Design a protein with these regions (language model features):
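Catalytic-domain carbohydrate-binding cleft regions of carbohydrate-active enzymes
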Residues: 1-192
Length: 192
């Protein structure tokens, strides 16, 4: 794990990981995933991990924002995050709801996206979205065509419409068959 309190690590993330390996190669947008995991037994360059826990996502968003803004193409580059704390809105203006299950369960599946979106909106994020079709899939938890279509319908009315193939793409329905492609194309036009 890279230490976001270590200036040398921050420089490496900005200059090598983000600018050189992504932006210099033409990447125009990316998911600045994670940013929330700071083990309480970490040894940091500066600060106590227990006290830094909530600040960690803000540091992650700030590093990404500074790297993008200092790049020659920075005004044309877009990134979004999933983790945050008070003040993260200054650095990350677009948030996604994280990794939902590929099902209709209220607490972890598609239905939980709506209250999560409102919650993030009330927290200062005007642009919030979710993975179309969900992400988490394990054992008997497999995405159905019905779920994929319903989620696509829902996200057609969100600020950002983005699909995800899940962690087990080989067993989950994907938007590749002719009928689903037509539905997705139609809803993409609604979104646009």
């Amino acid at each position: 794990m890279l230490d976001l309190t270590n200036p040398a690590a921050v420089e490496f993330i900005k200059e090598t990981l983000i600018k050189k390996n992504m932006l210099d190669r033409g990447v125009d947008g990316y998911m600045a995933d994670f940013g929330e995991y700071l083990p309480v037994d970490s040894v940091l360059h500066s600060g106590d991990p227990a006290e830094m826990h909530n600040e960690w996502p803000v540091l992650w968003a700030k590093i990404n924002r500074e790297a993008v803004d200092s790049h020659p193409r920075g005004k044309d580059v877009f990134f979004f995050t999933r983790s945050g704390y008070n003040g993260v809105q200054e650095y990350s203006t677009v948030m996604w709801n994280g990794d939902q299950h590929t099902d209709f369960t209220r607490d972890y599946g598609m239905p939980c996206v709506i209250p999560a979106t409102f919650n993030l909106g009330f927290s200062g994020f005007a642009a919030v979205h979710s993975d179309v079709g969900g992400f988490i899939s394990f054992a008997s938890l497999v995405r159905s065509r019905e779920l994929l279509v319903r989620w696509t319908e829902m996200n057609a009315f969100s600020p950002l419409m983005r699909s995800h193939e899940t962690i087990r793409p080989d067993v989950n329905v994907q938007p590749y068959d002719e009928r689903t492609v037509k539905i997705t194309a139609s809803l993409s036009r609604v979104h646009a």
